[in-house]
């Protein structure tokens, strides 16, 4: 199946994210949407950087402290260094990573993600989060990841685009069901307990990008049935922060997340 055509006249969440992180893979529609969203929610760029740093800490922790060597990153977005495979292969060069996204521009830049350590492996899969069977059944995944061994699944800054809670739970359940015990799920999503985050979600919706802010209870429920590790579900900058990095004020962080294990 051919990938969807790239429409540069309509803003896309991945390209807005790229622009607000200082990237260059975006278009006028994305920049205009980003300006309107930041006007409504001025701390959004700070929060996005904090979320990216959270991904880095989570990936490093799972590789270094839990020995996970297989990673499935769904909703990859545009390349932003350090990418997940770069983080985990610094810990374990033999680590294997599969990236999943369905944005045409990400497809164009996939080669930038596929520079792997010689001992490891990195693959890219064009698929939609909502179609879990197409992800888990893909030849690219089967050639890279052994589902009989633990896998760390990364759903970072993507679940806010799944508006229905039942659908979000179904997606997570379908992903985790075939995974081996010892597998992990890392999530982050927009919190409803921050006025700036809620304003940002409203601004995204005004630009045609359906977005949901979740309560702490709703975020915690996404990890139901799993063994949550410390510090639990928290604002992303407070998840095992780097001791040598100044901690941002809670008021500027829009994302809440956590990491849990399948036992």
Model-identified regions with their sequence ranges:
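Conserved beta-strand signature within the Rossmann-like core of class I S-adenosyl-L-methionine
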Residues: 151-155, 171, 179-190
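Short alpha-helix
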Residues: 210-234
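Short, glycine-/aromatic-enriched active-site segment of Class I SAM-dependent methyltransferases
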Residues: 192-208
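Core SAM-dependent methyltransferase catalytic element
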Residues: 232, 238-263
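Rossmann-like AdoMet
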Residues: 1-127, 131-144, 254
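A short SAM/SAH-binding and catalytic strip from SAM-dependent methyltransferases
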Residues: 129-130, 139-169
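Class I S-adenosylmethionine-dependent transferase superfamily signal
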Residues: 174-176, 223
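Short "lid" loop at the C-terminus of a central beta-strand within the Rossmann-like core
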Residues: 158-161, 190-194
């Amino acid at each position: 199946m051919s990938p969807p055509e790239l429409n540069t006249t309509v803003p896309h969440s991945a390209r807005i994210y790229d622009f607000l992180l200082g990237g260059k893979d975006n278009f006028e529609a994305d920049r205009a949407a980003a300006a309107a969203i930041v006007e409504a929610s001025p701390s959004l760029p700070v929060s996005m950087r904090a979320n990216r740093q959270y991904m880095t800490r989570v990936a490093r922790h799972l590789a270094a402290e839990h020995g996970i060597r297989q990673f499935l990153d769904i909703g990859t977005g545009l390349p932003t260094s350090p990418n997940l495979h770069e983080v985990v292969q610094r810990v374990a060069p033999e680590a294997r990573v599969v990236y999943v996204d369905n944005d045409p521009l990400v497809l164009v830049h996939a080669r930038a993600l596929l520079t792997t350590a010689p001992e490891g492996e990195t693959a890219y899969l064009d698929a939609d989060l909502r179609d879990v069977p197409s992800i888990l059944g893909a030849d690219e995944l089967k050639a890279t990841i052994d589902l009989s061994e633990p896998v760390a699944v990364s759903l970072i800054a993507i679940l806010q685009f799944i508006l229905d809670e039942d659908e979000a739970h179904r997606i997570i359940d379908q992903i985790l069901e075939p995974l081996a015990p010892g597998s992990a799920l890392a999530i982050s999503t927009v919190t409803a307990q921050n006025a700036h985050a809620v304003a940002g979600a409203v601004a995204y919706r005004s630009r045609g990008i359906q977005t949901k802010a979740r309560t702490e209870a709703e975020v915690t429920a996404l990890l139901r049935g799993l063994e949550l590790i410390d510090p639990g579900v928290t604002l992303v900058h407070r998840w095992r922060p780097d001791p040598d990095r100044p901690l941002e004020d809670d008021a500027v962080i829009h994302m809440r997340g956590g990491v849990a294990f399948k036992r």
